């Protein structure tokens, strides 16, 4: 959601929020973690030990060029968010209408209204996602949900929203942007 929609971490009671620069057209390999310091239970245990960089959470030399690039990407996304929001919704909806008009058995996963503007996840009855990916090599898309892309098992996220194993294995995910 960072860089795609406006939200307020206080209003939404967010204690932890991780995000990465490449999702905002910034450099790969750099990310950020928001921790709500006002919540005494929102603590992060050390996983790596060494220097006191990054608030003593992670040792290592800071990648200053990537950090600066990340900051610039956030700045640009903040300025262009409304325009990008409208553009990505338009692209997503046109693409979906085209898919539905040319394929039978297409079902959206989740709601078309209550989703990120740049995301489209659906399945086609009777067509496994891995087979569809082989047939449509000219398109860049993923199977399943973002957190289980590339897995041969049904996505636990898609199953949690009520899909069967077959439907989850038939699901594909498209992302839209500038």
Regions inferred by a protein language model and the residue ranges of each:
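Pyridoxal 5′-phosphate
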Residues: 1-178
């Amino acid at each position: 959601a960072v860089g795609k929609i406006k939200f307020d971490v206080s209003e939404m009671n967010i204690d932890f929020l991780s995000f990465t620069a490449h999702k905002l057209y910034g450099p790969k390999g750099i990310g950020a973690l928001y921790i709500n310091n006002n919540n005494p239970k929102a603590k992060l245990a050390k996983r790596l030990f060494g220097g006191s960089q990054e608030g003593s959470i992670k040792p290592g030399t800071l990648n200053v060029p990537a950090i600066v690039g990340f900051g610039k990407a956030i700045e640009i996304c903040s300025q262009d968010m409304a325009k990008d929001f409208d553009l990505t919704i338009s692209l997503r909806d046109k693409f979906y209408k085209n898919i539905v008009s040319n394929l039978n058995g297409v079902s959206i996963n989740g709601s078309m209204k209550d989703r990120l503007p740049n995301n489209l996840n659906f399945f086609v009855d009777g067509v496994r996602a891995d087979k569809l990916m082989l047939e449509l090599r000219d398109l860049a898309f993923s199977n399943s949900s973002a957190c289980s892309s590339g897995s041969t098992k049904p996505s636990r996220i898609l199953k949690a929203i009520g899909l069967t194993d077959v439907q989850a294995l038939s699901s594909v995910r498209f992302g839209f942007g500038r």
